Regions:
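Acidic, metal-coordinating catalytic segment for phosphate/diphosphate chemistry
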Residues: 1-23
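Class I (Rossmann-like) S-adenosyl-L-methionine-dependent methyltransferase catalytic domain
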Residues: 8-13, 84-86, 141, 145-151
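Conserved Nudix-box catalytic region and its N-terminal flanking loop in Nudix hydrolases
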Residues: 27-67, 71
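Nudix hydrolase/Nudix homology domain
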Residues: 41-42, 113-173
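A short coil-to-beta-strand element that immediately follows conserved catalytic motifs
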Residues: 71-81
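Active-site-adjacent beta-strand/loop module that shapes the phosphate/pyrophosphate-binding cleft
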Residues: 85-115, 129
Length: 173
């Protein structure tokens, strides 16, 4: 999968913790499906960590359903690109956190199912929203999100900008 960009200044030295993830890009017209944290007011693409026994695509389908209640149409899944994020760790177990975020374009069913949120996701009140990219970028870059990792929010904003530049959205916006 092609690399869209890399984030972080820390090199992957010392004790490294690697956590790959798969993320869903579902677009309809001038809007994209995103998870909105009502508690901290930020937007993220549905998706999350890839379990050891899963393929990227399996994780994409599972995580999108869990976080957003969206059912991915498996034969619509297409690679978009990867973002590598490196961060120094504040924990004692490892020195560097490495996350390869694999983004996939896909279509989703019109009907949604009940979310199956982790405790922190429920606490943050994760809600599916079909949002215009300009709005999600603005919120992620200008609102105080409390303790949330600003690098994650900037990653999502940059991916949205790439999608805009490549013409994936209709021009209603």
């Amino acid at each position: 999968m092609r690399v869209l960009f890399c984030m972080g200044e820390k090199s992957a030295d010392g004790r490294v913790f690697v956590r790959p993830s798969a993320r869903c890009i579902a677009i309809e017209g001038d809007r994209v499906a995103m998870v909105h944290s009502l508690q901290y007011d930020y937007y993220k693409f549905p998706g999350g960590g890839i379990e050891p026994q899963e393929t990227r695509e399996q994780a994409l389908v599972r995580e999108t359903q869990e976080e957003a209640g969206l059912l991915v149409i498996p034969d619509s899944i297409r690679e978009f690109g990867c973002v590598r994020r490196l961060e120094a760790s504040d924990g004692a177990e490892y020195d560097c956190f490495v996350q390869d975020n694999f983004y996939y374009l896909c279509r989703v069913e019109r009907t949604t199912v009940e979310q199956r949120l982790d405790d922190y996701e429920a606490q943050e009140q994760f809600t599916l929203e079909w949002v215009q990219p300009k709005r999600a970028i603005e919120v992620n870059r200008t609102v105080d999100h409390g303790p949330k990792n600003q690098n994650m929010l900037e990653r999502e904003a940059r991916v949205l900008e790439i999608l805009q530049q490549k013409g994936y959205f209709s021009t209603k916006e």
